[in-house]
Amino acid sequence: KLSDIAVPERALYLRTIMAELQRVASHLMATGAFINDCGAWQTPVMHCFRDREKVLDLFEMTCGARITTNYMRIGGVAFDIPDEFLPVLDKLVNGDLPFRFDELEDLIVGNEIILMRARDVGVVSPEVAINASLSGPMLRSTGVAWDIRKADPYAVYDRVAFDIPVGYN
């Protein structure tokens, strides 16, 4: 916006896809780290890291890097996606991940170690969350339905229909 450079439509969609994939990878890493910190390591942690690897494989397929992708550039993206990207992405988001998330939820929600160490710990009210400038999953976990992708959409988020995930701690 500052330099008045128009980003091609395809690049806007690719940016959105990559941002969402990074969000998934980040949430999987954070969830795995949380489980590990609670002492409930092994199965749930390995599930998180295994699924994160599948997302990182897509990054590597696209630009050769798994973590520091350096993909988004002024005016667009560094590379177009390879031909095999969309079939792998489709299998991941429409097959593997939904099943894995259900499986992971079952492993976490009923896990006695996690329940003993996390229940009623660090409960934050919506008012405190807002006053402390919490954002993202931390803010939404207090019941506040605010998401930057809806409040101030970038890329093509204004054209993507999604619900804001909200929890209540």
Residue locations for each model-derived region?
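Active-site bordering "gate/hinge" segments
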Residues: 1-169
